[in-house]
Amino acid sequence: MIPGQYILAKEDIVCNGDKKVTKVKVLNQGDRPIQIGSHYHFYEVNEALKFDRSVVIGQHLNIPAGTAVRFEPGDEKTIELVPYSGEQKVYGFKNKVDGDIQSYTKRGR
Protein backbone atom coordinates (compact mmCIF):
# COMPACT_ATOMS: atom_id res chain seq x y z
CA MET A 1 0.00 0.00 0.00
CA ILE A 2 1.22 3.48 -0.87
CA PRO A 3 0.53 6.25 1.70
CA GLY A 4 -2.60 8.14 0.63
CA GLN A 5 -3.58 5.43 -1.84
CA TYR A 6 -7.27 4.73 -2.36
CA ILE A 7 -8.35 1.10 -2.58
CA LEU A 8 -11.85 1.03 -4.01
CA ALA A 9 -14.39 -1.78 -4.15
CA LYS A 10 -14.93 -3.32 -7.57
CA GLU A 11 -18.73 -3.14 -7.36
CA ASP A 12 -20.74 0.08 -7.61
CA ILE A 13 -21.80 1.86 -4.44
CA VAL A 14 -25.60 2.03 -4.26
CA CYS A 15 -27.18 4.74 -2.12
CA ASN A 16 -30.83 4.53 -1.05
CA GLY A 17 -31.19 1.28 -3.01
CA ASP A 18 -33.73 -0.13 -0.57
CA LYS A 19 -35.94 2.99 -0.47
CA LYS A 20 -39.10 3.76 -2.43
CA VAL A 21 -38.37 6.46 -5.03
CA THR A 22 -40.97 9.13 -5.81
CA LYS A 23 -40.60 11.08 -9.05
CA VAL A 24 -42.03 14.60 -9.10
CA LYS A 25 -42.10 17.26 -11.82
CA VAL A 26 -41.06 20.64 -10.36
CA LEU A 27 -41.31 24.10 -11.96
CA ASN A 28 -39.58 27.24 -10.69
CA GLN A 29 -42.17 29.99 -11.24
CA GLY A 30 -40.05 32.56 -9.42
CA ASP A 31 -37.68 35.16 -10.79
CA ARG A 32 -34.63 33.93 -8.85
CA PRO A 33 -32.62 30.69 -8.90
CA ILE A 34 -33.51 28.23 -6.12
CA GLN A 35 -31.07 25.62 -4.87
CA ILE A 36 -32.16 22.69 -2.69
CA GLY A 37 -29.67 20.66 -0.66
CA SER A 38 -29.60 16.89 -0.43
CA HIS A 39 -31.27 16.57 2.97
CA TYR A 40 -33.76 19.46 2.87
CA HIS A 41 -37.37 18.40 3.56
CA PHE A 42 -38.77 18.84 0.05
CA TYR A 43 -42.29 19.55 1.32
CA GLU A 44 -40.95 22.79 2.84
CA VAL A 45 -38.95 24.17 -0.10
CA ASN A 46 -39.48 27.67 -1.54
CA GLU A 47 -43.11 28.32 -2.51
CA ALA A 48 -41.99 29.50 -5.97
CA LEU A 49 -41.34 25.83 -6.77
CA LYS A 50 -44.64 24.41 -8.03
CA PHE A 51 -45.44 20.69 -7.65
CA ASP A 52 -47.84 18.39 -5.78
CA ARG A 53 -46.64 18.90 -2.21
CA SER A 54 -49.00 16.28 -0.79
CA VAL A 55 -46.90 13.45 -2.22
CA VAL A 56 -43.52 14.64 -0.89
CA ILE A 57 -44.10 14.91 2.88
CA GLY A 58 -41.23 13.24 4.74
CA GLN A 59 -38.93 13.03 1.71
CA HIS A 60 -35.65 14.52 0.51
CA LEU A 61 -33.75 14.51 -2.78
CA ASN A 62 -32.27 11.19 -3.93
CA ILE A 63 -28.80 12.66 -4.54
CA PRO A 64 -25.43 12.22 -2.79
CA ALA A 65 -25.07 13.89 0.62
CA GLY A 66 -23.70 17.40 0.42
CA THR A 67 -24.87 18.03 -3.13
CA ALA A 68 -27.82 20.10 -4.39
CA VAL A 69 -30.22 20.63 -7.27
CA ARG A 70 -30.57 24.13 -8.73
CA PHE A 71 -33.69 25.45 -10.43
CA GLU A 72 -33.16 28.53 -12.58
CA PRO A 73 -36.22 30.77 -13.17
CA GLY A 74 -38.58 28.93 -15.52
CA ASP A 75 -36.75 25.59 -15.13
CA GLU A 76 -38.88 22.45 -15.02
CA LYS A 77 -37.24 19.22 -13.88
CA THR A 78 -38.36 15.78 -12.82
CA ILE A 79 -36.58 14.95 -9.59
CA GLU A 80 -36.35 11.82 -7.45
CA LEU A 81 -37.18 11.83 -3.75
CA VAL A 82 -36.73 9.20 -1.03
CA PRO A 83 -38.22 9.03 2.48
CA TYR A 84 -36.22 10.01 5.54
CA SER A 85 -34.91 7.06 7.55
CA GLY A 86 -35.08 6.55 11.28
CA GLU A 87 -37.91 7.76 13.49
CA GLN A 88 -39.77 9.54 10.67
CA LYS A 89 -39.66 12.87 12.49
CA VAL A 90 -38.86 16.21 10.86
CA TYR A 91 -37.92 19.35 12.80
CA GLY A 92 -36.87 22.80 11.66
CA PHE A 93 -36.71 23.93 8.05
CA LYS A 94 -39.86 26.13 7.83
CA ASN A 95 -41.38 24.49 10.94
CA LYS A 96 -44.35 23.13 9.01
CA VAL A 97 -44.12 19.59 10.41
CA ASP A 98 -42.00 19.84 13.58
CA GLY A 99 -42.59 16.29 14.71
CA ASP A 100 -43.82 12.93 13.53
CA ILE A 101 -44.50 12.78 9.79
CA GLN A 102 -47.45 10.37 10.12
CA SER A 103 -49.15 12.51 12.79
CA TYR A 104 -48.74 15.60 10.63
CA THR A 105 -50.27 13.84 7.64
CA LYS A 106 -53.23 12.58 9.71
CA ARG A 107 -54.07 15.92 11.34
CA GLY A 108 -54.17 17.59 7.93
CA ARG A 109 -51.91 20.26 6.59
From Swiss-Prot:
SUPFAM superfamilies to which the protein is assigned, alphabetical: Urease, beta-subunit
Entry keyword annotation includes Cytoplasm: yes
GO biological process terms held by the UniProt record: urea catabolic process
InterPro entries noted in UniProt: Urease_beta-like, Urease_betasu_sf, Urease_subunit
Alphabetical UniProt keywords: Cytoplasm, Hydrolase
Intracellular or extracellular location(s): Cytoplasm
Pathway annotation from the record: Nitrogen metabolism; urea degradation; CO(2) and NH(3) from urea (urease route): step 1/1
Family membership noted in the UniProt record: Belongs to the urease beta subunit family.
Entries under HAMAP family matching the protein: Urease_beta
Protein name as catalogued: Urease subunit beta
Organism, as annotated: Bacillus cereus (strain ATCC 10987 / NRS 248)
Source species taxonomy: Bacteria, Bacillati, Bacillota, Bacilli, Bacillales
Gene: ureB
